[in-house]
Amino acid sequence: MLDQLSVESIPPLLGASKAQLTHWAQTYQQPAYRGQQVHQWIYQKGVHSLSDITVLPKQWRTEIADIPVGRSQIHHRSAAQDGTVKYLLKLADGQIIETVGIPTQKRLTVCVSSQVGCPMGCDFCATGKGEYQRNLACHEIVDQVLTVQEDFQQRVGNVVFMGMGEPLLNLEQVLAAVRSLNQDVGIGQRSLTVSTVGIPKQILKLAQHQLQITLAVSLHASNQRIRTQLVPSAKHYPLEKLLKDCRAYVTQTGRRVTFEYIVLSGVNDQTEHALELAHHLRGFQSHVNLIPYNPISEVDYQRPTQKQLQQFLNSLQSQHITASIRRSRGLDKDAACGQLRATQMIDPASS
């Protein structure tokens, strides 16, 4: 992958493993440890240009200066009152993606995008209201984590693939990013969460990799009728089949599945819905995350009250379903769940 080729044909180095970078350095007749130095400077020191790696011989630095590391630019940064920071990152082709840094007392979490836009068109989600452009490459995903880590000057402890896009439609690059975040950046697999609305066959394909990551399935409904209304792709992936595949995932990996459930007042928040959901999940190694709807301008869904949320939670727990309410972060900067969208999908300066 990283043999000595013309600059135009060499992919960005970000996302490459220590072994790959060692081999790459050797193609330039450099000793193996030079590749290890490049690895350290890319992943630990956050270098944006190979010419800035001062421990390398000056002549070689000049020779490789034009080979891209694969880092993006911060196009815009906005901080919410709760400390959450939303970033618009400008990619090499001018496309804009969103990334969110979410600090808590215990850890720094990064919510990464896996696509530019999203083709799934979920009714309550801002990203789905915009145009889908393309999949992100591995380096464009890993870069988001390093960018937040550098900006906060704090080590990232948790990464969730819950930003723009459907990760399982970009499974190859997402898996490559998971490997790099784990082995190169040093984030444990159990601190990585991949979210999906459910893509036929892809959950089973993911299970074959036997990863220790968390799979989060965006369920959002207790029956097929409501789910089809909220998630158009559910027409091609019935709820029963989705849940069957999730059970198979648990069996194959030994990891419980997290079910994300955006609560919409008057739509999917009634006691009957909670009991229906509990029926589906009884005996299932799972956890339900209840997420209060975060408003977007295109639709008139209503956010539930705290009382409604608590009643729904109580109904689930009365049926012995493990569940919790997720606190919304970054709401005042449109950085909360379901609110992500790049206000400029392409930077005007690049066109």
Curated annotation (Swiss-Prot):
Give binding positions for [4Fe-4S] cluster: C118, C122, C125
Gene Ontology cellular component?
cytoplasm
What the record notes about the co-factor is: Binds 1 [4Fe-4S] cluster. The cluster is coordinated with 3 cysteines and an exchangeable S-adenosyl-L-methionine.
Q: What reaction gets catalysed by this protein?
A: adenosine(2503) in 23S rRNA + 2 reduced [2Fe-2S]-[ferredoxin] + 2 S-adenosyl-L-methionine = 2-methyladenosine(2503) in 23S rRNA + 5'-deoxyadenosine + L-methionine + 2 oxidized [2Fe-2S]-[ferredoxin] + S-adenosyl-L-homocysteine; adenosine(37) in tRNA + 2 reduced [2Fe-2S]-[ferredoxin] + 2 S-adenosyl-L-methionine = 2-methyladenosine(37) in tRNA + 5'-deoxyadenosine + L-methionine + 2 oxidized [2Fe-2S]-[ferredoxin] + S-adenosyl-L-homocysteine
User: Start and end of every Radical SAM core domain?
Assistant: 104-332
Catalytic residues at: E98, C337
EC class of the enzyme, as a word = transferase
Predominant location category: cytoplasm
Chain sites annotated for binding S-adenosyl-L-methionine:
G165, E166, S195, S218, L219, H220, N294
Note the coiled coil stretches, chain numbering. none
* Protein name (record): Probable dual-specificity RNA methyltransferase RlmN
State which gene encodes it: rlmN
